[in-house]
């Protein structure tokens, strides 16, 4: 929760467009050092919340895009009666609350390709 509070404080300073993806670690580390969180600053921890990371990096605009990806995905899955798609997106959404999932290359690939593959399958209607 310490990192969540720090991330929210940084977001308040850079609300619209964020600090940028390249400056994220430096800005968060500097903010932690200014708060006296030397252990957190030393290890350069992120917030372990993808929504907060996106807010700090890309601002409100980036957060809106990320949320729209989920909303559009849920809408498509519901319209196609794709329960596997709904469950997959739900798992991603819950994971994003407690982990910075798309901060790594493996996370990006999984987040992009798995839903894409699931929405092109033609499952039986379960809903």
How does the language model describe each region?
Residues 47, 55-59, 102-110:
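Membrane-interface micro-motifs in multi-pass membrane enzymes
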Residues 57-90:
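Hydrophobic transmembrane alpha-helices and their immediate junctions
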């Amino acid at each position: 929760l310490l990192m969540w509070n720090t991330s929210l404080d940084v977001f308040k300073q850079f609300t619209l467009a964020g600090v940028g993806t390249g400056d994220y670690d430096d800005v968060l580390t500097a903010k932690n050092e200014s708060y006296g969180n030397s252990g957190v600053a030393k290890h350069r921890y992120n917030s372990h919340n993808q929504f907060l990371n996106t807010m700090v990096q890309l601002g409100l605009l980036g957060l809106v895009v990320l949320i729209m990806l989920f909303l559009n995905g849920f809408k498509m899955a519901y319209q196609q009666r794709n329960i596997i798609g709904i469950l997959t997106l739900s798992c991603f959404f819950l994971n994003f609350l407690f982990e910075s999932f798309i901060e790594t290359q493996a996370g990006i690939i999984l987040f992009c390709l798995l839903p894409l593959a699931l929405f092109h399958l033609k499952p039986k209607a379960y809903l």
